[in-house]
Swiss-Prot record:
GO terms for molecular function: ATP binding; metal ion binding; methionine adenosyltransferase activity. It comes from Populus deltoides (Eastern poplar). The gene is METK. The keyword Nucleotide-binding applies. GO terms for biological process: one-carbon metabolic process; S-adenosylmethionine biosynthetic process. Its cofactor is Mn(2+); Mg(2+); Co(2+); K(+). InterPro entries: ADOMET_SYNTHASE_CS, S-AdoMet_synt_C, S-AdoMet_synt_central, S-AdoMet_synt_N, S-AdoMet_synthetase, S-AdoMet_synthetase_sfam. This is S-adenosylmethionine synthase. PANTHER family: S-ADENOSYLMETHIONINE SYNTHETASE.
Length: 395
C-alpha cells in the first residue's frame, strides 16, 4: 500500500461556551429574519460565569426579545443550574445592540434601495469551499466523525442513556489516510479522543465504558476500528466544572469546526450571527455548493474553491478552483463552468440559496455540529447543482 499519513480534526458539542455563543447569535438572527427578511444583523455573544452578553449592530423591523432568546437557547442546550455551568433562568443577561453604521448601509444596500443584483458585499474578504469524495457527505472523514461523536454525546445526554453527562464536551479524531493521486482515501481510525463534562457521581471507568458503548460504537464504522486504535476518554481525569463556569465563550471562535476540520483552507471569517449580506457567511456557503457540485458531478474527486470580495462591490474580485490533480478536465475549464453556473453576487446568493428565510431554527441549527455536510432541507447550499461537462471534453 502507498505511504500513509495521519490527519486530525476536532469538534465541540453544543454545551461548549463558544458554541453556546454561536447558537445565541444565530437564534437572534433567526428571530430577526423570521419577522423581517431584510434585517441587517451582526450579532456577537460572550459568556462567563452567571452572565451572557449579546452585542453588535442590528437594523430590523422585527420586535425581538433578546433576553428571552438568550434564556431559551441556554435552557434548550441544558444549562438549567449553576452546577452544570450556567443557570438559564437566573443568570445575568446584558444587551448592547445598536443600528448598522449608516456608512456601511449606504455602501452595501443603499439604505435598502438597491436591487438584489446591485447589493454589494458587506465587507472585504476571501472564503473557501471544499469537497472530497471520501464520505457520502462529500466531507473529510476526520471532521465527519469528530462532529458526529459530539452530536451523539448530546443525544445520549438528552435521552437519558448516559444520565451522568453534562452539556460541555469536546471530541477529536485522527484518521490514517493515503494520498491516491490527490484524492484522500481513509484507511483506519488511529485515535479517538473524547473529553466530556460529567457529574460527581460517575467513575472514570464508567465514563470510558459508556463512551465506548453508547457514543463511539454507534458513530464510527467498525471497518475503521482495529486493535491498534487508541482511545483517550476523559484523559484529564476530571471534568465536572464546565460550560461558561469552566471557561469564557465568544461567538466565532470555532470556525474550523464549523467548516472542514482543518482540511482545505479558511479565510478567517466566522458565520454565526451574520445576515446574508455578510459574505463571510453567504460567500462560504456558495463556494461549498460549487465545490460539492464539482465532486458530485464527477469533475474531480477533491476540490477547493475560493471567492473574494470588496466592500460595496457586487461582483467578486476573484474566483479560484484547485482540484489537487484529481480533475477530469483542466482546472481552468472547471473554473469556467463554475463561473457560468454560479452567481457569486451577494444579493443573488441570498435569493438562490434562500438565505433571507429565518424561522424553524434555521440558522440556529447550523451553529452546532457544522454548517456543511448536513442532510437537512434548510441547508440549501448542500443541494448539488448538476454540472454538464461531457460536451466540453469532446470539444
Amino acid at each position: 500500500m502507498a505511504e500513509t499519513f495521519l490527519f486530525t480534526s476536532e469538534s465541540v458539542n453544543e454545551g461548549h461556551p463558544d458554541k453556546l455563543c454561536d447558537q445565541i447569535s444565530d437564534a437572534v438572527l433567526d428571530a430577526c429574519l423570521a419577522q423581517d427578511p431584510d434585517s441587517k444583523v451582526a450579532c456577537e455573544t460572550c459568556t462567563k460565569t452567571n452572565m451572557v452578553m449579546v452585542f453588535g449592530e442590528i437594523t430590523t423591523k422585527a420586535d425581538v426579545d433578546y433576553e428571552k432568546i438568550v434564556r431559551d437557547t441556554c435552557r434548550n442546550i441544558g444549562f438549567t443550574s449553576a452546577d452544570v455551568g450556567l443557570d438559564a433562568d437566573n443568570c445575568k443577561v446584558l444587551v448592547n445592540i445598536e443600528q448598522q453604521s449608516p456608512d456601511i448601509a449606504q455602501g452595501v444596500h443603499g439604505h435598502f434601495s438597491k436591487r438584489p443584483e446591485e447589493i454589494g458585499a458587506g465587507d472585504q474578504g476571501h472564503m473557501f469551499g471544499y469537497a472530497t469524495d471520501e464520505t457520502p457527505e462529500l466531507m473529510p472523514l476526520s471532521h465527519v466523525l469528530a462532529t458526529k461523536l459530539g452530536a451523539r454525546l448530546t443525544e445520549v445526554r438528552k435521552n437519558g442513556t448516559c444520565a451522568w453527562l453534562r452539556p460541555d464536551g469536546k471530541t477529536q479524531v485522527t484518521v490514517e489516510y493515503y494520498n491516491e493521486n490527490g484524492a484522500m482515501v481513509p484507511v483506519r481510525v488511529h485515535t479517538v479522543l473524547i473529553s466530556t463534562q460529567h457529574d460527581e457521581t460517575v467513575t472514570n471507568d464508567e465514563i470510558a465504558a459508556d463512551l465506548k458503548e453508547h457514543v463511539i460504537k454507534p458513530v464510527i464504522p467498525e471497518k475503521y476500528l482495529d486493535e491498534k486504535t487508541i482511545f483517550h476518554l476523559n484523559p484529564s481525569g476530571r471534568f465536572v466544572i464546565g460550560g461558561p463556569h469552566g471557561e469564557s465563550g465568544l461567538t466565532g471562535r470555532k470556525i474550523i469546526i464549523d467548516t472542514y476540520g482543518g482540511w482545505g483552507a479558511h479565510g478567517g471569517g466566522a458565520f454565526s450571527g451574520k445576515d446574508p449580506t455578510k459574505v463571510d457567511r453567504s460567500g462560504a456557503y456558495i463556494v461549498r455548493q460549487a465545490a460539492k457540485s464539482i465532486v458530485a458531478s464527477g469533475l474531480a474527486r477533491r476540490c477547493i474553491v475560493q471567492v473574494s470580495y470588496a466592500i460595496g462591490v457586487p461582483e467578486p474580485l476573484s474566483v479560484f478552483v484547485d482540484t489537487y490533480g484529481t480533475g477530469k478536465i483542466p482546472d481552468k475549464e472547471i473554473l469556467q463552468i463554475v463561473k457560468e453556473r454560479f452567481d457569486f453576487r451577494p444579493g443573488m446568493i441570498s435569493i438562490n440559496l434562500d438565505l433571507k428565510r429565518g424561522g424553524n431554527s434555521r440558522f440556529l441549527k447550523t451553529a452546532a455540529y457544522g454548517h456543511f455536510g448536513r442532510d437537512d432541507p434548510d441547508f440549501t447550499w448542500e443541494v448539488v447543482k448538476p454540472l454538464k461537462w461531457d460536451n466540453k471534453v469532446q470539444a
